[in-house]
Amino acid sequence: MRYLKRITIYISLLILVSGCGNNKEAEIKQNFNKTLSMYPIKNLENFYDKEGFRDEEFDKDDKGTWIINSKMIVEPKGKDMEARGMVLHINRNTRTTKGDFIIKRITEDNKGIPDVKDKKYPVKMENNKIIPTKQIKDKKLKKEIENFKFFVQYGNFKNLKHYKDGEISYNPNVPSYSAKYQLSNNGYNVKQLRKRYDIPTNQAPKLLLKGTGDLKGSSVGYNHLEFTFVENKKENIYFTDSINFNPSRGD
């Protein structure tokens, strides 16, 4: 049931084939490093001046739109799964940013069929500040939204090249790829996540880098990272983050 729930959260499913060597791991790292080398970007307005990978999917005069997404998903033992996070569309053409803070709860009926209930709170960004665009009466929730920080604002992957012995998967038919690494609770990124979120486990996470599309670069597909603290039938705790550069869609 864990996988059904994750489909409803990601709205995508990767089909991976394991068994690749060090060369493929190096290619995957190189692909992700194009984005991860930008971390941290404390001022999100800097994205207005950042160029991303362009291909034939982009119109000639389209400067592109950055889509950033961070969320924490927690399913304690015996309780419902809840995801809380935010997505922003940073339009380089109009130099405007809008998005949503999203709370998603997933329950199961007596047959084990997941039921998804989500609530979206529209936001905009001005002067590097997140501003709700509709009235929010819940003061605690409003503060949570206004103070929200994306992982790209504090994460750091300068040591990515030193990550060793990853579990590598690659499927050239999709194409899709992934690399998984065991992390330590003493690592910088893990400490930053524990500082910002109430993570109800002392277990050190695994870092999963996964994506779809041409490893050499493509605007079709996506790259996505996940810190998995706990993953089993009764309990799931993980954090996800993504930054993708896409053609603008009339925003």
UniProtKB/Swiss-Prot annotation:
Region forming the signal peptide: 1-19
Major location category of this protein: membrane
Organism expressing this protein natively: Staphylococcus epidermidis (strain ATCC 12228 / FDA PCI 1200)
Its membrane topology: Lipid-anchor
Gene Ontology terms: cellular component: plasma membrane
Cellular compartments annotated: Cell membrane
Family assignment from sequence similarity: Belongs to the staphylococcal tandem lipoprotein family.
Full protein name: Uncharacterized lipoprotein SE_0144
Keywords: Cell membrane, Lipoprotein, Membrane, Palmitate, Signal
Lipid attachment residues per UniProt (N-palmitoyl cysteine): 20
